[in-house]
Amino acid sequence: LLVTVLVVALVGSFVYSLVTNVHPDYTIALVTSYSMPETGLNQLEECITPYADDRNGDGKVVVSVVNYVFSDGADVDYTEQEASMVRFMADASSNEVMIYLHDEGAFDALKSNLGGFFQYNDGTAMSEDAKDFENAMISWDDVAAFAKFQPRTEEGELYTAEVLSELYSRLRVSCRAAEGSSIEGKEKDMAYH
């Protein structure tokens, strides 16, 4: 009887986790030289969600922003940077993320590994040996939704609206190249891209 109860509880727990697990419609990479506070990530997700659609058909629009921390400076925790690299490479190889927000410090720390990764602003793919990354990014303020975004100070947070605004204003936006990725030729995925 005890074994049966345990099996039922285990199966119930598994089914519950499957049913309540939220799958984002969009996962956006935030590649920075600092750790964005949780309130900053949440506000960024709220900013982007009204412009997104229900890609997975579950009746909800969910945007997830994932922060990857990279820097050439000594002020970044080595363990955190290594964990970011592992997550970044896994997400990049699975094509989970197609939109990248990045600051100069993090981008400079990574750019030697990004040949052919992004597409140019006109939608064409960068070649593997291309180094003209400035043609594959636009500034935060050049995106209307971001330019209008007004962060708010949340009670008990160290990061004020002014600090968050400054951090956001340093960001640039790049899109992953679809050519050569696993989404190439998949109509639904290309529509997302």
Specify the residue positions occupied by each region the protein language model found:
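Gram-positive cell-envelope targeting signals
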Residues: 1-33, 42-45, 53
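Loop/turn elements at helix/coil->beta-strand transitions in domains of secreted/extracellular proteins
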Residues: 26, 60, 94-98
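Short acidic, S/G/P-rich loop/turn micro-motifs used as interaction or catalytic elements
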Residues: 34-39, 105-109
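Short, flexible/disordered intra-domain loops and linkers
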Residues: 36-39, 69-85, 117
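Short, polar/charged alpha-helical segment
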Residues: 38-62
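Acidic, glycine-anchored loop motifs typical of Ca2+
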Residues: 54-65, 72-78
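Extracytoplasmic "Venus flytrap"/periplasmic binding protein-like
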Residues: 82-140
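A structural signal for short loop-to-beta-strand junctions that line the ligand-binding cleft
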Residues: 118-192
